[in-house]
Amino acid sequence: MAALLLLPLLLLLPLLLLKLHLWPQLRWLPADLAFAVRALCCKRALRARALAAAAADPEGPEGGCSLAWRLAELAQQRAAHTFLIHGSRRFSYSEAERESNRAARAFLRALGWDWGPDGGDSGEGSAGEGERAAPGAGDAAAGSGAEFAGGDGAARGGGAAAPLSPGATVALLLPAGPEFLWLWFGLAKAGLRTAFVPTALRRGPLLHCLRSCGARALVLAPEFLESLEPDLPALRAMGLHLWAAGPGTHPAGISDLLAEVSAEVDGPVPGYLSSPQSITDTCLYIFTSGTTGLPKAARISHLKILQCQGFYQLCGVHQEDVIYLALPLYHMSGSLLGIVGCMGIGATVVLKSKFSAGQFWEDCQQHRVTVFQYIGELCRYLVNQPPSKAERGHKVRLAVGSGLRPDTWERFVRRFGPLQVLETYGLTEGNVATINYTGQRGAVGRASWLYKHIFPFSLIRYDVTTGEPIRDPQGHCMATSPGEPGLLVAPVSQQSPFLGYAGGPELAQGKLLKDVFRPGDVFFNTGDLLVCDDQGFLRFHDRTGDTFRWKGENVATTEVAEVFEALDFLQEVNVYGVTVPGHEGRAGMAALVLRPPHALDLMQLYTHVSENLPPYARPRFLRLQESLATTETFKQQKVRMANEGFDPSTLSDPLYVLDQAVGAYLPLTTARYSALLAGNLRI
């Protein structure tokens, strides 16, 4: 009888789930549950790590959240295990600990510490105990054999530059390599902040970055000295302490830091130096890519470092895996996800100073690589390479990264598989990240109830015209429906803070949204539009600054680019909006790079665009280029391209315009450009 009473409810359950948009998601429930268990285990492991450090050092309860403490722990637990492979050089975790100890001692000398003629003997590790003594207070560091000399002569590498002070920021302008890591870890051990400076910056942008993070010293690669020579007077005028990371003929006042490091003993330094007062203290600055202006110095906290230790565990990577990393270390993907993520599980990383598509698979075979960390462009480079024997005999089982376009994704897996691709989404300064743990092509993550319970976020309606979220009459934001593009936001909390940028609170303007769903709440604004489909998969739609309006409709640059990339004669596409005099909004423009040895087929291109895009989304202008303008992490320069416009008298690239009357893309001559400005050419 009871079963008969429950029967109507059971029959109505699918309808209820369908109404709540949950029915299509049920097929993915096993994967959602499996990832939720993994995520909870990861959180528990990180918490246990922090608690173990607190128990070992009651006076520094936050010490276990520091990078220095984790390295010291690995040097004890996995001393002989290979941590780093760079070319022919290999370093174990214990060797990494000793190398970073040398670097820490060199930096502490610049702070005014006197280790004595034999370098002293601290008697404790970075994770150990010790009497608290602020360096610079004039007291001897307990058990360290070092005294703070202070004053004159404390800083040795920068000539007339001011000595370093406790807690100062030291900027690194170095290529990816072991020395980058030892200096970074050494700075962390010495209680100093590090700033990762993009290696391509020079002149104004470089000086801006150094000023914004308050750098007091700069360590630069010797190979950069020639291009930096015009900047040296300005760097000295800023009072920067200057070092070169290697031998050579250096300008006056610049000494070889690596020589100073090698002269130090490799004994540990006092652990209290690297123990943060608060887990949200800033320990690192990483600069944003600067696609929309000058780079901003994102504040990276010890909490972020701890969270990034769990990245590879979340991805299902194990401590016996070998990770291939060919990304710049001055960006989060290389340093925090790649290096810190590897340290989180105690695995091995094969570090490349520069990515080589032709050498990649041979490297993977030589070092028995099992995990490859990518950004989308690297995968595209690989699929565009001619076939080789090495690409089929590898042991790579997992590719983890971001920015992989669906067409490249399919070609990559079909050609180099079987392997799993885990596409992720995240921001350097953000408090939200997603992982496509199912491998569904084209998705950057899942919006399952389980995932959002562990890592909360929301998609809210957004007006691309006003650049603001759409709010209801009560002033609250509204969640999107399945298939509707929405602004990705995440609640700011003690566990998921937003620390902003160095240089002033005005730099974070617009990054925080208040009263989103209820009075008083605060959410981080990612500035990215995502779409959640009826199965709960998240797909990247566009950046808010990239989406534009034309003919009263919203145009997503990524969607237009995907249509273009289906053409076999196109290798790269960059879509953006340009202002056209006499027209509202912005017209679409596409910069194209041909795939050798193909030629541009304007007739096929027009037919393809007309069949696959609505009229308002079809680019009005084309620009043929040898290569696309990108940042060093291969992010397309849309703002720069939009500012350059489409004037044939100022651009040397071949330009084309969509002539609606003719129904074709025609060369944009000076005459047609004048006709367009006069309103005689309909676009």
UniProtKB/Swiss-Prot annotation:
Biased composition range(s): Low complexity: 133-145
Region of interest (Disordered), ranges: 119-145
EC number: 6.2.1.15, 6.2.1.3, 6.2.1.-
Topology within the bilayer: Single-pass membrane protein
Highest taxon above the source species: Eukaryota
Membrane-crossing residue ranges in chain numbering: 3-23
GO MF entries: arachidonate-CoA ligase activity; ATP binding; long-chain fatty acid-CoA ligase activity; very long-chain fatty acid-CoA ligase activity
Subcellular location field: Mitochondrion membrane
Record GO biological process: fatty acid transport; long-chain fatty acid metabolic process
Keywords tagged on the record: ATP-binding, Fatty acid metabolism, Ligase, Lipid metabolism, Lipid transport, Membrane, Mitochondrion, Nucleotide-binding, Transmembrane, Transmembrane helix, Transport
Tissue specificity statement from the Swiss-Prot or TrEMBL entry: Expressed in bronchial and bronchiolar epithelial cells (at protein level).
Example of a GO cellular component annotation carried by this entry: endoplasmic reticulum
Composition bias, Gly residues: 119-128
Reactions performed catalytically: a fatty acid(in) = a fatty acid(out); a long-chain fatty acid + ATP + CoA = a long-chain fatty acyl-CoA + AMP + diphosphate; hexadecanoate + ATP + CoA = hexadecanoyl-CoA + AMP + diphosphate; (9Z)-octadecenoate + ATP + CoA = (9Z)-octadecenoyl-CoA + AMP + diphosphate
Enzyme class, spelled out: ligase
Pfam families: AMP-binding (PF00501), AMP-binding_C (PF13193)
Family annotation (InterPro entries): AMP-bd_C (IPR025110), AMP-bd_C_sf (IPR045851), AMP-binding_CS (IPR020845), AMP-dep_synth/lig_dom (IPR000873), ANL_N_sf (IPR042099)
Binding site for ATP: 288-292, 331, 428, 528, 543, 635
Sequence similarity: Belongs to the ATP-dependent AMP-binding enzyme family.
Functional summary from the UniProt entry: Mainly functions as an acyl-CoA ligase catalyzing the ATP-dependent formation of fatty acyl-CoA using LCFA and very-long-chain fatty acids (VLCFA) as substrates. Can mediate the levels of long-chain fatty acids (LCFA) in the cell by facilitating their transport across membranes.
Annotated protein name in UniProt: Long-chain fatty acid transport protein 3
